[in-house]
């Protein structure tokens, strides 16, 4: 049974055609008249021109890759049939030839486009005041090209969902599975994350930050303890010699003057010991500041946002297309979805293409940043039962923003 994902919609204006190349599997479930009716009793007929096209027909079989060109050139050089300059000239000519062939193929594809779309079918008929909406169950798979249109005077809205088709269990366990352009893209995730120990890696990144200055502090403390020992002793010894030297040179030096000199030597020795001790104390608050805990806040909706790493790139705003990496888990630690390699998941923020917890939790995030979102059921799938996600489940996502378009 297909798994319904984020929303799909299309608004049909009378008299216009809407060619659509299906990049992700989707299902149309409802057609309805618009809020404002141009014709109070007019009849609107929704039609689709449909003809599946295999993926192989959309891709060029004659494309030249750089590796193919290099292998051919190296082979010719080894045979001694071409000089270096001739190789370069041939490569340039082939590149021009490839561009011309690609251009001709594109023109042929465009010219054949109209001929390939042969079948036109009526999806439903809507009449204002009588039948203003109709339930549908139509599925369009990746690689198809369809054209939607409506006849009549009223606007019609088509609604549905992107879907995840059933796959083998082996494919589902692979992080880089075949449905990457549909289900994997829904949430998305950088290649530096791993499926089995993602949370531990994220925590390790945080704890390593305050641990870096710790060895410096430990090394500085013994050094501070050692410094006053050699400095204080020579100072005291020097002052003692100064006491003895005047005593030998000038026997008339009074006892009061000797005591004064001895006291001065003692004070200087204590100051020498206090300076490194104060430096060691000053290092401790600095270490505490560096070991700053991750920023965590709870929104009125119950969504908990924890900034693991603050990014330094562009900031995510409503209407921007984000590229994401992510790992989704239940509160018991069981992972139900992830995107950690391949093409990052791409979606437009704030347009309802993902669950509300993502639309709210990713706003204000900067490229390069990492967050942990704890999303209550009301902002996720609610009481819906989805494979791998029980009803009324609180979800946890470790997300990383990798791009903004």
Swiss-Prot record:
Residues 49-117, 164-297 are annotated as: Disordered. It is an enzyme of class 5 (isomerase). One of its GO terms (molecular function) is peptidyl-prolyl cis-trans isomerase activity. It is found in: Nucleus. Residues 319-405 form the PPIase FKBP-type domain. Inhibited by both FK506 and rapamycin. Disulfide bonds: none annotated. It catalyses: [protein]-peptidylproline (omega=180) = [protein]-peptidylproline (omega=0). SUPFAM superfamilies: FKBP-like (SSF54534). PPIase that acts as a histone chaperone. Histone proline isomerase that increases the rate of cis-trans isomerization at prolines on the histone H3 N-terminal tail. Proline isomerization influences H3 methylation thereby regulating gene expression. This is FK506-binding protein 4. It comes from Cryptococcus neoformans var. neoformans serotype D (strain JEC21 / ATCC MYA-565).
């Amino acid at each position: 049974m297909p798994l319904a994902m984020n929303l799909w919609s299309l608004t049909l204006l009378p008299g216009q055609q809407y060619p659509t190349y299906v990049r992700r599997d989707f299902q149309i479930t409802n057609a309805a008249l618009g809020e404002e009716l141009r014709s109070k009793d007019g009849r609107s007929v929704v039609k689709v021109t449909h003809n599946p096209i295999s993926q192989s027909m959309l891709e060029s079989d004659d494309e030249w890759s750089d590796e193919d060109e290099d292998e051919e050139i190296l082979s010719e050089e080894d045979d001694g049939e071409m000089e270096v300059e001739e190789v370069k000239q041939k490569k340039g000519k082939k590149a021009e030839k490839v561009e011309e062939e690609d251009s001709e193929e594109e023109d042929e594809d465009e010219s054949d486009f109209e001929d390939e779309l042969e079948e036109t079918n009526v999806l439903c008929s809507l009449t204002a005041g009588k039948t203003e909406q109709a339930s549908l169950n139509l599925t369009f798979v990746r690689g198809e090209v369809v054209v939607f249109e409506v006849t009549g005077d009223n606007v019609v809205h088509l609604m549905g969902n992107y879907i995840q088709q059933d796959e083998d269990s082996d494919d589902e366990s692979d992080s880089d599975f075949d449905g990457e352009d549909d289900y994997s893209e829904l949430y998305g995730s950088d290649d530096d994350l791993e499926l089995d120990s993602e949370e531990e890696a994220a925590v390790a990144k945080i704890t390593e930050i305050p641990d870096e200055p710790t060895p410096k502090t430990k090394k500085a403390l013994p050094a501070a303890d050692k410094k006053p020992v050699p400095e204080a002793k020579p100072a005291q010894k020097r002052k003692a010699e100064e006491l003895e030297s005047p005593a030998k040179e000038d026997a008339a030096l009074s006892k009061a003057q000797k005591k004064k000199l001895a006291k001065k030597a003692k004070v200087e020795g204590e100051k020498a010991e206090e300076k490194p001790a104060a430096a060691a104390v000053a290092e401790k608050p600095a270490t505490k500041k560096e070991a700053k805990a991750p920023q965590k806040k709870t929104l009125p909706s119950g969504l908990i946002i924890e900034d693991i790493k603050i990014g330094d790139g562009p900031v995510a705003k409503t209407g921007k297309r984000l590229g994401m990496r992510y790992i989704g888990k239940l509160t018991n630690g069981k992972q139900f979805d992830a995107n950690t390699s391949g093409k990052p998941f791409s979606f437009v923020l704030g347009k309802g293409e993902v669950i509300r917890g993502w639309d709210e939790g990713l706003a204000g995030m900067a490229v390069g940043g990492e967050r942990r979102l704890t999303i209550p059921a009301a902002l996720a799938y609610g009481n819906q039962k989805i494979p791998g996600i029980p009803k009324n489940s609180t979800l946890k996502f470790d997300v990383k923003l990798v791009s903004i378009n």
